[in-house]
């Protein structure tokens, strides 16, 4: 989950808060000599509405006296259903303010629930919607966040939330952008056109700004025309810095040569389609990395005139690069090194990591309101690595592990599944399994009267092509996968996929396992083309064949994957509500 940059956003919230001072209720004018601790003790002896009103008064005094964390705790524990209309309005405004300032987005979302239940003055309603939109962005729900922020802008015309709106829109895929369309709303339409324009420009900055000029002519009164998002204006500085030459370091022999061949095919096919489509296609030079002599490979890359390097692929080679202070050329390695984090200057790391999927499963389960998880992973090195990734992320979020079961991949799933759901009964199951084993798990859950237990898996249970008869037993199981593998669930159909021409060419003739690696090659080429943008604008996103890609602070490329849920044996769309219903 990516947290919003708080600079301009905080300023926007502050401005609206100050503008709303005229409607601040009388609780902020109460006598300053009231003792909040005595009020809380008094509330403990009271019941119902009287206790809720006393706690609200105490929380207000705590907040104004600088004891904001305690004030937030009091408001979170308060039964707001016991408050009268005006007091409940005051509770919502104060809780949302404290939740925003104290880093508790769930509290903000709870406060904003009053918008569905009571009529508020416009200024107050817009303030709550703004805070709710920002909170949902922090909770990893860019679709609803963008919807609310654009609603606020449509009502107020504010331009100082443009960066917040752009931050959320740039995280959305084609299907999600379509879901935001509001015919007749010029602000929403303009934002969606701008987002698609940037997404379709690739790494060609000149092409982007030529199209941007056309957009500005067509949208003269749009808030983003008057004040372009900061990330877009910063791209102006990259004009004339496009990548013209890329060196690719892949092994031509050895155990990774088959993987390298698939990645190379993806790179070459996409480069040809970019050129054929009139884009700025960088020249490619391929060098055999089988011998692992990294210094020699960099010398060859520099001699070829390369501006960016793709590779190496071998994990040990990437780990060796991580031991250096700097690499000679900006480098997109095709694996992750073994260091806890990458600190090498100019080194970026990208791959299709099962550990990443496990972390996303943990975050999604938490966002969906689950707090106790069981794990069912294979008893091998792969299961240990991926299982640890889920366990660590789940624990960091505050979740409990009810049971962790390591199973024999060659055995029946019956006993291991039974043990995974035995006492204490979890409220979700994390499953790491290949298709044959995974298909046994839901029927076993049904046998043990646990068919309603949510199951979150990784993409490894899906073979990559719809097989309704074989996969019907997986109905209800949720899993993330690359957009190119689940086009209907990811973007509403193959035609809306990123790099559709390349997708058509590669999908027609290749097995699913090879197809994933080719998709990785496509995104590697696109990331290399955009290297100046990645370096200049940390956190900028790309809608790719393998997910929504962005570079973390340590140069590792983070993939946010779309989710699918088996329905009648085929992957179907599924959306997280992002709000949950459990206590933090």
Model regions and ranges:
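Alpha-helical protein-protein interaction scaffolds
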Residues: 33-232
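Segments of small-molecule ligand-sensing domains
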Residues: 504-573
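Extracellular/periplasmic periplasmic-binding protein-like sensory domains
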Residues: 426, 442-520
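Short beta-strand elements at the ligand-binding edges of bilobed clamshell
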Residues: 339-363, 471-483
